[in-house]
Amino acid sequence: MFNRLILQCRSGFEKEAAGEITDRAAEIGIYGYCQLEEGAGYLSYICGQSGDALELMKQIRFRSLIFIRQWMACGDKLELSPDDRIGQIEALIQEYPLCNEVRIEHPDTTEGRELGKFARKFGSALAQKLKKTGTIKSSQAAGMRLHLFLLSGTEMYLGVAPVKNAAPWPMGIPRLKFPRN
């Protein structure tokens, strides 16, 4: 189920992030390969065995990574029908580890930022539905965060990341709020 890592990075640094994760994975004996597109702002590290992506996240300290802004363990890319995306996601995550929050993200590129408005609206509706049905628990005991990484309104990766071993900020980018004058 979790044979892939989606790794977000700054656009143009995909090759450096690929080299970094490949080296770190090899150090702990988990092998795979990277799929990337130059300038996409993310890449995939596909592990040789199912479950290895979560094992990588257990053994590598996220804060020790230099080029990777955010990560999540997931399966293959999903193509969801626009008619009932929330229902489809709810059905898919029944076998996922218990999560305590939802984070909707997209590539930090010009094309990716166009998904921002959709991501905010969809994320809010999805979180409300999952909390209402009890699929997402508010307790910190869960320790995992559900991630949706949007590529379009219907294409996405659905995965998880440990709350304490991933970036605390959406898309791995800290945002500063300036006081009003």
Predicted features by range, described:
Residues 156-181:
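Glycine-rich adenosyl-nucleotide cofactor-binding module
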Residues 43, 154-156:
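Hydrophobic residues embedded in beta-strands of well-ordered beta-sheets
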Residues 144-147:
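A short glycine-rich, hydrophobically flanked beta-strand micro-motif that places a catalytic Asp/Glu
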Residues 149-151:
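Charged, structured surface patches that assemble and position nucleic-acid processing machinery
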Residues 2-10, 14-142:
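Non-catalytic nucleic-acid substrate-recognition regions in nucleic-acid-modifying enzymes
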